[in-house]
């Protein structure tokens, strides 16, 4: 969380949504995001916690963690389906950071977000670079938690395994420094175009 986002969180009072009770399992998470300015709810005072989230909505939430970069429009992205979209600058930011990769040149901003897509984005935010070869150790493969509806052939298999198993690992880090030509922001990111592979060494139960 950027310093200015944290400052906003620390200074903002509790946000009361009409449909989020203090006893709800997600109450603390909603409060954290609302106080940090990551989510705002709806004009009628509701949050709609059970409503599906679109890719654009989620990408904006993630981009707000980097809100110091959003005062200047971020253009020149690679996605062909976001020109003029309300979330264009947020998606372009995340694409430049290597967090959003899209699908054949499309960001599909109005599609509902899937759990697999969520896992992939969160892994990239946290710098967790993984693929199916990460689990090549036989003992690791035998010990890790798996899911009956997510087999190794699923595109998000490695991402979901990474997000749902606590484990030890080893890796080498390739770092590249990125600065866009307008000087809008500078970020140090892993070279996701040629990533190193995280090797799992032990599953924590």
Residue ranges and their predicted role:
Residues 1-27, 40-56, 64-89, 96-115, ...:
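Feature responds to low-complexity, polar/acidic, surface-exposed segments characteristic
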């Amino acid at each position: 969380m950027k310093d200015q986002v944290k400052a906003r969180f620390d200074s903002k009072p509790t946000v009361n949504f009409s449909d989020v009770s203090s006893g709800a399992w997600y109450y603390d998470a909603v409060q954290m995001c609302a106080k940090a300015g990551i989510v705002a709810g709806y004009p009628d005072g509701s949050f709609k916690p059970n409503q599906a989230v679109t890719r654009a909505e989620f990408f904006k939430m993630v981009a707000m963690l980097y809100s110091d970069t959003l005062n200047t429009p971020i253009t020149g992205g690679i996605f062909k389906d976001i020109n003029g979209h309300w979330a264009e600058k947020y998606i372009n930011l995340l694409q430049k950071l290597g967090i959003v990769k899209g699908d054949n040149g499309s960001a599909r901003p109005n599609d509902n977000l899937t759990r697999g897509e969520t896992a992939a984005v969160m892994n990239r935010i946290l710098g967790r670079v993984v693929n199916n070869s990460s689990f090549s150790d036989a003992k690791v493969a035998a010990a890790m938690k798996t899911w009956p509806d997510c087999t190794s052939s699923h595109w998000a298999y490695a991402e979901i395994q990474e997000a749902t198993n606590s484990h030890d690992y080893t890796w080498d880090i390739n770092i590249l420094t990125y600065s866009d030509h307008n000087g809008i922001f500078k970020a140090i990111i892993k070279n996701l175009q040629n990533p190193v592979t995280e090797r799992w060494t032990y599953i924590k139960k």
